[in-house]
Curated annotation (Swiss-Prot):
Residues flagged as site, Important for catalysis: 145, 195
Single GO cellular component term: cytosol
GO terms for MF: 3-isopropylmalate dehydrogenase activity; magnesium ion binding; NAD binding
Self-association state and partner proteins as the record states: Homodimer.
Native organism: Syntrophotalea carbinolica (strain DSM 2380 / NBRC 103641 / GraBd1) (Pelobacter carbinolicus)
Name of the protein in its database record: 3-isopropylmalate dehydrogenase
Main enzyme class: oxidoreductase
Gene field: leuB
Function summary: Catalyzes the oxidation of 3-carboxy-2-hydroxy-4-methylpentanoate (3-isopropylmalate) to 3-carboxy-4-methyl-2-oxopentanoate. The product decarboxylates to 4-methyl-2 oxopentanoate.
Cellular compartments annotated: Cytoplasm
Keyword Oxidoreductase among UniProt keywords: yes
């Protein structure tokens, strides 16, 4: 089994550098505990890269990523760069090109409510008692966001805006197999999201998903219209295990599912290419208002590193250990400000203290 890995580390803007520092501590501990090695190359991205190199994704950063087994990404953006043209701002100028260059067609967004944090959710306790763990599998490079033609035509009050929604058999089959593989390793339940009652692309989507399901007889497949799925996520989220979504539907539902957990600071994500390459990042933003104050929640960045261990390095045992260490810290009452409720048994801790606690749990496990 491979024991050495090359990682491109892109801390970015806002809280990115400080939460990334905690993820680096955790990877140090993984090296020690599991006898592996991570060669880490740090590179600029986002606003930090604009300030230094003139663009959000410098060529040097791309080269470092191309020479790596995976990318661990922090966060980008902030009001400092909001006056730039939209395509030059940190978010669009860095993330979209990275997805295109590396063929990142699949987005995995876990939405996890840990048993110790059910009170932080916006849902009633009886709806989420014991917590839940949902994985949203979103197709990332097709659908209405990318298909052509699109644009605005005409003048004055007669203008017309238009977009095209399109999927091919191959695009749907590729993402469907990722979702079935994930479901097979989890609760063996897959819900495919579409709008097949009105959209031709969804008719194709459903037909392909049904065809692929024959290769996964151990996974229970069901279909759900996207409007019903949005309602069911709020009404009874524990019914779901893996959700398979086209691009736009996954964009919306993954954010909805994420907010049910109480804080974006808890949630990781992975964007995967074919093979083992992927980019891993927190689901939240750069939070420039709290940057540098040592109060940001590093858990999403740490869990993103755990996803990197699982999907790009094949180190499932290490990933499990990191995730369990995080769960143990939360069960012990440790809370950063975003999830602190001043309840009995809770202890307010800093960014660095939370990282140190996860490392301590990991080492002793």
């Amino acid at each position: 089994m491979k024991k050495e890995f090359k990682l491109a580390v892109l801390p970015g803007d806002g809280i990115g550098p400080e939460i990334m520092a905690e993820a680096m501590k955790v990877l140090d501990a993984v090296e020690q505990k599991f006898q592996v090695r991570f060669e880490r190359q740090f590179a600029n991205v986002g606003g930090a890269a604009i300030d230094r190199d003139g663009k959000a994704l410098p060529d040097a950063t791309v080269e470092i990523c191309q020479a790596s087994d995976a990318i661990l990404f922090g966060s980008v953006g902030g009001p400092k760069w909001d006056t730039l043209p939209a395509e030059e701002r940190p978010e669009r100028g860095a993330l979209l090109p990275l997805r295109r260059i590396f063929g990142l067609f699949c987005n995995l967004r876990p939405a996890i409510v840990f048993p110790a944090l059910t009170s932080a959710s916006s849902l009633k306790e009886e709806v989420i008692a014991g917590g839940f763990d949902i994985l949203v599998v979103r197709e990332l490079t097709g659908g209405i966001y990318f298909a052509q033609p699109k644009g605005v035509e005409g003048e004055g009050g007669e203008r017309r805006g238009f977009d095209t929604m399109a999927y091919t058999d191959a695009e749907v089959e590729r993402i469907t197999r990722v979702a079935f593989d994930a479901a097979r390793k989890r609760g063996k339940k897959l819900v495919s999201i579409d709008k097949a009652n009105v959209l031709s692309t969804s008719v194709l989507w459903r037909e392909v998903v049904e065809r692929v399901s024959a290769d996964y007889p151990d996974v229970v497949l069901s279909h759900m219209y996207v409007d019903n799925a949005a309602m069911q996520l709020v009404k009874a989220p524990k019914q779901f295990d893996v959700l398979l979504c086209p691009n736009m539907f996954g964009d919306i539902l993954s954010d909805e599912a994420a907010m049910l957990t109480g804080s974006l600071g808890m949630l990781p994500s992975a964007s995967l290419a074919e093979g083992s390459f992927g980019m891993y990042e927190p689901a939240g933003g750069s939070a420039p208002d709290i940057a540098g104050k040592n109060i940001a929640n590093p858990v999403a960045q740490i869990l993103s590193a755990a996803m990197l261990l699982r999907y790009s390095c094949g180190l499932a045992d290490a990933a499990d250990a990191v995730e369990k260490a995080v769960e143990n810290c939360l069960a012990a009452g440790l809370r950063t400000g975003d999830i602190y409720q001043d309840a009995d048994g809770e202890q307010l801790v800093s960014t660095s203290a939370m990282g140190d606690a996860v490392v301590a749990e990991l080492i002793k496990s």
